[in-house]
C-alpha cells in the first residue's frame, strides 16, 4: 500500500524516473549495431594442407588420416569432416555451441603439432588452420575490370593493395580475391627439344634456381667510406630468363629459350572471374562477428572513392552486390509493423475507455517500456535485428496489458464516484498482484528457452530477453507511472462520449450481456464443456503430429548462390565458355540485377543478385525454377541454384543443395557400391529435387605402373621418376621474384600443346647416373582409368554426402520421412551407415527438443503460479486455457499453408504467456470475491467473468492487434514474421472464443474436487478420532 502511495504522492520523482528510463533507452538505441539476425557464431575451425601433385587418395591416406586421428581427440568436437582433392586436404571441425572458439583453436594447433611427425616430408608447408563463421554470408561484392590491364595485373592490384586496405576498415573480417592469380613467369618446356639437346627437367629447374638467387652480399669498409655490395643476381621478367644457360652440349651452351617458351603470365591459368559474363576480378567482403552490417558497409562505401583515386584511372572498381538494401528494407518493415501495432493498441484503449485522457496514459506507458528495453539490449550485447524488433512488436500488446488492467480498474472506481487519488490507490492495490502474476508468469515462459545453450537458445535468446525486459519495465511502469498519471489526469465523473463511441459501447454491452446469459447455461452443463476441453487436447496432439514441419522459414533475401558443374573430362576453356553463357542468360533475366562469379577447373559458382522485392512480382523460389528451366538442357554442364539465407547452419561446405544426407562406411568398396544405388533411389522421390552427391567417379586418370626391377638395373629411383612427372605436369613453382610490392613465382611445366593426352608421356625421359637418356616408356607402362575427384571422410570413416532440395508443395518433414522409408526399403547393409547433416540434422534434433522446451515452459509457469497463489490447483485452472490456443495456432498455420517452424514454436510459447492472462484476471477476482463476499464458487466465477469482461477483451485485442501487422505485412523479411503473427493471432482468436467458458468451468470443477477431497479427509479424521 505504501509502495503504491509513494509514487502517486511524488509525481515529479515518478516522472523523472520514467524520463531516465526513456533517455537511457534512446541513447542505447543509437549505439546498437544492426544485423539481419542475432549473433550466431558457430564454432567452426578449418584445417588445410597442401602437397602439389598428390592424388586425392594419397592426400586422404597420408595427410587427412594422421591429422584426423590427432584432431579427433579434441574435447567438444561435434563433427569432423574432410575433403581431399588433387594436392589439397581440407578438414572442417564443428564444435559444440558451448565450446570457446579461441580455446578450441589452441587445441587444434596442438593437435597439428602432434601429427606433424606422421605427415609426408614432401609437404612444402605445415598444415594451417583458420576460424570460420559459416553462418555469415558476404556483406559486399566488388569487381575490378579493365580493357587496358591484364587479369594478372588486376589481381595483383586487388590482392596486394585493395584487399589490404579494405581489411583495415572497421568491421571487416576478411576480403577474399577470386577470378585470377598473381603475375608469374611461366616456362613452358618443349619435350622434343629437351630430348634432342639431352637436357633433363631437373637440369632446367636447377639452372633457373641458380640464376635467380637473392642473397645478402655484404659491404666494403674503408677508413673514410662504406660501400654496399650489389649484384645482378635477380631476374625480374620473362625476357631476362631467356638467355639462362641450362646445359652444355658438345661445348656449346644450351639456353632456356632453346628448349622452352618463356612468357609473362600468371601463376594459375585455370581460373577465371566474370561479372555479367565479362572478365573481372571479384572481391568478396565478410564482416567481423557481431559487427554492425549497415555501419560497416557505409564505412566501406566511404573508403571506395579514396581507393579509386589510388589505382589507374582506366580500371573500373565498382560495387556489384551488397546486403544493406535488403537489411534496411526488412528492418524498416519491422519498424513499420511496430508503429502500426502501437497505434492499434492505443486505439483499442480509446474505444473501450472512451476518454482521451485515459488513452494518453497507455500512449505514454507503452513507448517508455519499449524504449527502455533498448538499454538492456545494449548491455547484453544484442543488435537491432529482425527477431529483436519482432519481440518489441509483439511486446506492444503485452506491455499495454499491464497498463490496461490498472487503468481499467481505476476507471471503474472513478465511474463509481471515488476521487482520482483514492481511485488510483485503491485500483492499483486491487490489481497489483494480478499484474505481477501476469508479468512474472509470462517472463517464466522464456526461462527454459534462455537457459538452453543449443540451437534454440542461441537463436532466440535476443528475442526472449528483449521481450522479458519489455515486460519487466512495463510491470514497473504500470505500478508507478500509470497510477500516478491516473491520479493527476483523470476525473471522477465519466467523460461525455461521441455518438459513435456510445454506439461501440452499446455493442460491447450487448456482447457482455449475451456472454453472461450463455455463461450461466454453460455453468449448469459443465460436463459437456469438460468433454469438449478433453477433445481439444486430443485435437492438439493430432494436429501437431500431422502438420507439415520445417526448421526455419526460407527467406527471400534477393540473393542466389549458383553452382555450375561440368563433366569431369571437360577442358578449362570449355568450362569457361559454359560459365560465360550461363551468366549471360541469367543476367538477361528481367528479375536479375547482376551476377558475379568465377570458375576453376571443371566447376564454377556465381553470386546472383535479384532486383528489390518491390520491383519484382515473383518470389525467389519462382525465379530459381524459371532460371533452371532455361538452362536445364545445356549439354556437358549442370546448374544448381539455391537461395542464400541470412542464417546458415552446419553441414558440409560447398554443397550444391540446401539439405544434406550423409553415407558413412569403414569399407570404401561397400560405400562406392551403395552410394549410386541410394542416390538414384532418392532422385526418384517426388518430395526431393536437385539431388546430387559429392562422390564422383567420372574423372579420368592415367595409371602408371613402374617396372621396379628394370629401374634398379638402369639406376633410376622411383623418386627420380616421380620428380620428372611432377616437374613436367605439376605446374611447379621453382623460383621466386622479389619486387618491392610483392613476390611473384616462376612456374615450370611442359607446354600445354604437348599435354593434350596420354601420348605426352612418351616424350618424357630420365637421365641416369651414366648420362643415358632413358624414355619413361622404357621402364613404365600406363593405362587410362577412372578416379574420384575427391575423397571424403566424416570422423575417421569414408563418407559421401547426398545433397537435395525440397520439391515444391512439400516440406522438409515430408522429405525426411520419404528418405527414411526409402532407406528401409533398400535394405542397405549395416556396413553403410547414414545420417542427416546440416539443416536436416538440426531439424531432427529440434523436433525432439521442441516438445521438451514447451513442456518445460508450462511446468515453469505452473511452478511460478503455484508460488504466487500458494495453491496446487489454481495454476491448473489458469493453464487450462492453453489447449484451445494451441488448436487455434495450428489450425491457422494450416489455413495459411505455413509449415510449423522454430518461429511458429516461439509463437506457441508466447501464447502460453498470453492466453493465461485472461484466466489470471478471472481467477484472481473470483478468489477475492469468495474470500470477501461470502459467495459460492459458481457465483464468484460468474461475477468475476462478467466484471472483468472489459479488461479481458481489451488485453486480448491489444495482443491480437500487436501481432496482426506481422501477419499482414508482406514486404522484405515477411517470411520470418508471418509464422509468428499467424500463430499468435490464430491462438488468440480460438482462445478468446473458448476460454471465456472453459476457464469458469474448470474453476468450478477443481473447486468441487477440492471440496470432495476435503470432505473425505474430514470423514477419515472423524473415524480415526471415534476409534
UniProtKB/Swiss-Prot annotation:
Bilayer disposition of the protein: Multi-pass membrane protein
Keywords: Cell inner membrane, Cell membrane, Membrane, Transmembrane, Transmembrane helix, Transport
Gene3D superfamilies according to UniProt: Multidrug efflux transporter AcrB pore domain, Multidrug efflux transporter AcrB pore domain like, Multidrug efflux transporter AcrB TolC docking domain, DN and DC subdomains, Multidrug efflux transporter AcrB transmembrane domain
InterPro entries assigned to the protein according to its UniProt record, in alphabetical order: AcrB_DN_DC_subdom, Acrflvin-R
Subcellular location: Cell inner membrane
Transmembrane segments: 12-32, 333-353, 360-380, 387-407, 432-452, 463-483, 528-548, 851-871, 873-893, 895-915, 951-971, 982-1002
GO cellular component, one term: plasma membrane
Keyword Transmembrane helix: yes
Domain of life: Bacteria
One Gene Ontology term of the molecular function aspect: xenobiotic transmembrane transporter activity
Stored Pfam families: ACR_tran
Oligomeric form and interacting partners: Part of a tripartite efflux system composed of MdtA, MdtB and MdtC. MdtC forms a heteromultimer with MdtB.
Entries under NCBIfam families matching the protein: PRK10614.1, RND_permease_2
Family listed: Belongs to the resistance-nodulation-cell division (RND) (TC 2.A.6) family. MdtC subfamily.
Protein name: Multidrug resistance protein MdtC
Organism annotation: Xenorhabdus bovienii (strain SS-2004) (Xenorhabdus nematophila subsp. bovienii)
